Amino acid sequence: MKLQVLDANGTSVKEISVNDAIWGIEPHQQAMFDAVIAQQASMRQGTHKTKTKTEVSGGGRKPWRQKGTGRARQGSIRAPQWKGGGIVFGPTPEKKYLKHVNKKVRKLAIKSAFSLKVQDKNIMIIDQFGIDKPSTKAMVKVLNNLKVNGEKLLIITTEGDEVNFKSSRNIEKVNIITSAGINIYDLLNANKLLVTEQAIKAIEEVYS
């Protein structure tokens, strides 16, 4: 498979061959679903907690005597049926939400997401941004040239690309990650992918 490579002006400068096993497979919906659920589960802090009857402050003595008042018997004003009482079977921080997805399925999900973007023509490859020092204005100009400014965009670059990281971090709807930080949620959450040519090579080294 061949994909167009653009320059910072949005002009096609060449074509490169990419691995069909990464960019041209039939997207596996179940693998992508499982990987997204697993990633979202791992993002949960799990610090939720409610107090039981024994943990709520107060309620140490019986509110009224057992017999003779005509009212229902009560042992504590912190029993669950009382306002301000303890919670029965509430959430505790001991609950674990982690879901396991094996490496093979996770790789299949990433390849499926890449292939889906290619099929939908929602991926662009850029040779270089041509930005010498951090500049949000310069990055916005490049995105305008590529006609993706205002889109929910994921930029994938390589390690050590501090200039482009700093140039894009204040732009609304733009997220930038390295090829080593690729994850299924960011890929599917973005409407468009903008990948550097060097990142394409790094991705193919890992996922081939």
Curated annotation (Swiss-Prot):
One of its GO terms (biological process) is translation. The keyword RNA-binding applies. The keyword Ribosomal protein applies. One of its GO terms (molecular function) is rRNA binding. It comes from the Bacteria. Coiled coil: none annotated. Residues 42-77 are annotated as: Disordered. Keywords: Ribonucleoprotein, Ribosomal protein, RNA-binding, rRNA-binding. Pfam families: Ribosomal_L4. Signal peptide: none annotated. GO terms for cellular component: ribonucleoprotein complex; ribosome. Part of the 50S ribosomal subunit. NCBIfam families: rplD_bact. Belongs to the universal ribosomal protein uL4 family. One of the primary rRNA binding proteins, this protein initially binds near the 5'-end of the 23S rRNA. It is important during the early stages of 50S assembly. It makes multiple contacts with different domains of the 23S rRNA in the assembled 50S subunit and ribosome. This is Large ribosomal subunit protein uL4. It comes from Spiroplasma kunkelii.
